[in-house]
Amino acid sequence: MAIKKQMDLLGVIVLGLTTAIGGGIIRDVIIGVIPPSSVQDTIYAKVSIATSLLVFLVAYIYRDRPIKYSFKLVYNNLLLVSDSIGLGLFTVVGINAAYHRLNSPGFFLLVLVGVVTGVGGGLVRDIMAGDKPYIFVKHIYASASILGAIVCIYLWDISGQSIAMLAGTSTVFLIRFLAARFKLDLPIIQGHNFKE
C-alpha cells in the first residue's frame, strides 16, 4: 500500500511496522500490559522492518519492468494464503494473551482482543495512509476474525488451548480464504441517496 501511494522508504517501514505490531499494542493496552509486549520483545518489529526493506528493494528493482500475469497470480495467491493464516494466528494469539493475563476474562473481551490483535494494525495502517479501512469494505475480513475467535473461545475449556487455537486459526483461514477466492462480501447499501 505504501509503495502504491508513492511513500518513501520510511513510509513503507512505518506502515509495515504499524500493520505488524499495531493490533498487539492496542490489545496490550486493553488488557493492561504496559509497556506493550511488542515493544519489549522486538522480534516482530525486526521482522517487520526487514520485510518492509525487502519489499521496498524488490519494488525498486522492478519498478519499470512489466510484470507478467502469471507472476501477479502467484503473488496474489501467496499473499491471500499468508494473510489468511496470519489473521487467524494473530486472532488466537490475542485470545491467548487475554487468558494468560486476566482472571476469568469475559466472552466479549476475549472476542474483542482477538479481533483487535488480528485486524487492529491493518486498520491503523489504512487510516494513516488515508484510505477507508480494508476490513470494512473488502471481502469478509474482520468477520472471519470474529467467527474464528468465537470458535477458539468456545473450544478453549472443552478441548484445551492447543486444539482451540488450531480450530480458531483454521476457521479464520477457511472463511477468509473462501471469501476472497469467491469474492464474498457483506452486504452494503448502495444508491444515490447514500453517496458522499
Question: Which sequence ranges carry the predicted segments?
Answer:
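Short, highly charged, low-complexity non-transmembrane loops/tails of multi-pass membrane proteins
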Residues: 189-196
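Cytoplasmic-side transmembrane-helix entry/capping segments in multi-pass membrane proteins
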Residues: 11-18, 43-46, 71-86, 135-144
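The feature marks the first
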Residues: 1-20, 28-31
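C-terminal ends of transmembrane helices
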Residues: 1-5, 56-73, 123-133, 179-187
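Loop-to-transmembrane alpha-helix initiation sites
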Residues: 40-46, 106, 137-146, 158-169
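Helix-coil boundary and interhelical linker segments in multi-pass alpha-helical membrane proteins
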Residues: 29-39, 93-109, 154-164
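Transmembrane alpha-helical segments of multi-pass membrane transport proteins and ion-pumping complexes
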Residues: 20-21, 25-29, 48-61, 87-96, ...
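Structural signature of hydrophobic alpha-helical transmembrane segments
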Residues: 38-53, 105-118
